[in-house]
Amino acid sequence: DTLDFDYLIEHNKILLVNLSKGKIGETNAQMLGLIIMSKLQAAILKRAKIEPEKRSPYYLYVDEFQNLVTDTFASLLSESRKYGLGVHLTNQYFAQLPEKIKDAILGNVGTIIAFEIGMEDAEILSKEFEPFTKEDFTNLRKYNFYIRLMIDGKTSKAFSGESLKPNNISISNLTEEIIK
């Protein structure tokens, strides 16, 4: 059967896709990921027909998103807010990304959180996280982070925080519970 992305978005459904290169191979993971992203983008763009105040928010979470970046992904980032799409991206470091995508992220993303990073990324992010310096980023202790929030359309002053330490609960034991 096929996936109806319009239905998923309209009914706030969750789609989980495991694109593990180890399970399906690198080429298959990238191809499937790109197909899903293009279908999702087409469904998101159709929301232009819905009055803005009637668009319910929809959220896209992409881990290791550097594997799925295209030029159209940059345009999705720049237009996501007006279509009611919240985008949550994670990756390891900026060097994995084309320059156009880096610019799209820094120009359009409201909230950025960073844990300890290398000097090259610290050079980039310290400009976004004043008063924190590149040395502050490279010397963060385990579980500590810097964050810059978007609140009511305005960027907050960057601040530091400490995340909870992971507990020893196995996620695989909670899978059924999470899916419910």
Predicted regions and their residues:
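Short amphipathic C-terminal alpha-helix that caps PH/PH-like domains
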Residues: 32-40, 125, 129, 165, ...
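Conserved P-loop NTPase motor module
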Residues: 14, 31, 134-180
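Conserved residues at beta->alpha junctions
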Residues: 64, 116, 163-165
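Conserved ATP-driven motor cores of ASCE-family P-loop NTPases powering translocation/secretion/packaging/pilus
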Residues: 76-158
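P-loop NTPase motor domains
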Residues: 1-85, 101, 139, 145-155
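Hydrophobic residues at beta-strand termini and immediately following loops
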Residues: 17, 115, 161
